[in-house]
A protein has these predicted regions:
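Short, cysteine/histidine-rich loop/knuckle motifs that typically chelate Zn2+
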Residues: 146
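Short Cys/His-rich local motifs and their 1-3 flanking residues in nucleic-acid-associated proteins
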Residues: 149
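N-terminal secretory signal peptides that target proteins for export/translocation
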Residues: 1-4
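Composition- and surface-driven signal marking solvent-exposed, interaction-prone regions
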Residues: 6-9, 160
Length: 193
């Protein structure tokens, strides 16, 4: 048996590893959807807040994110915002999402969590493979605190709107830079995986 020189083995690893580490196409789709949720929500919120309507922004924020989720439900995808301090009970994280949020909170506390952080992996749930993708939502600007800041400092009409729309709201008391939650995308994968 002929023995390969060590540099040949290293060269093969260098060529093979990038292919093995490449994202599945569903990961790029999930990344794009998460970006849509963040960008569309941000644009609509900025418009409502520019008009001096932080209480109206609460309704808009929910409707935009839910609209994007509905667009992808037909494909069997689940797209949602989750948090360990929910405003809408439908945004309560599942076990996978809770673990990612816990890990990110630790990273945030250590100063290692960036807005561009993401987590993706293929998991098996209920006998079916799925791509799980998450991207953090941070309290990135002072304007976020109009709806998510200290209760005594919320924007005009926000406390009243929260009591009406979300009587069990837990999503206040944040400070600038805090981890608010995450965009979570779950895409079922074909039987071939």
């Amino acid at each position: 048996m002929r023995r390969q020189p060590p540099f040949t083995a290293v060269a093969l690893l260098v060529l093979v590893l990038p292919v093995a580490a490449a994202d599945p196409p569903e990961a790029e789709q999930a990344r794009a959807v998460a970006g849509q949720v963040l960008e569309r929500t941000k644009a609509v919120l900025q418009s409502a807040l520019r008009d001096g309507q932080p209480a109206a922004a609460l309704r808009v924020c929910a409707s935009v994110a839910q609209g994007i989720a509905r667009e992808h439900e037909q494909q069997g995808w689940r797209v949602r915002r989750v948090s360990d301090r929910v405003r809408n009970p439908a945004d309560t994280p599942d076990a996978y999402e809770r673990e990612v949020l816990r890990t990110w909170q630790e990273e945030k506390s250590a100063g290692r969590l960036a807005p561009t952080t993401e987590r993706q992996e293929i998991v098996t749930e209920g006998g079916q493979s799925a791509l799980r993708y998450m991207r953090p939502i941070l309290i990135a600007a002072p304007v976020c605190l109009q709806c998510h800041g200290e209760p005594a400092k919320l924007g005009p009409g926000v406390a009243e709107a929260l009591r009406e729309l979300y009587p069990g709201d837990q999503a206040t008391g944040y400070s600038l830079g805090d981890l608010r939650g995450a965009i979570s995308v779950r895409i079922p994968l074909g039987a071939s995986r």
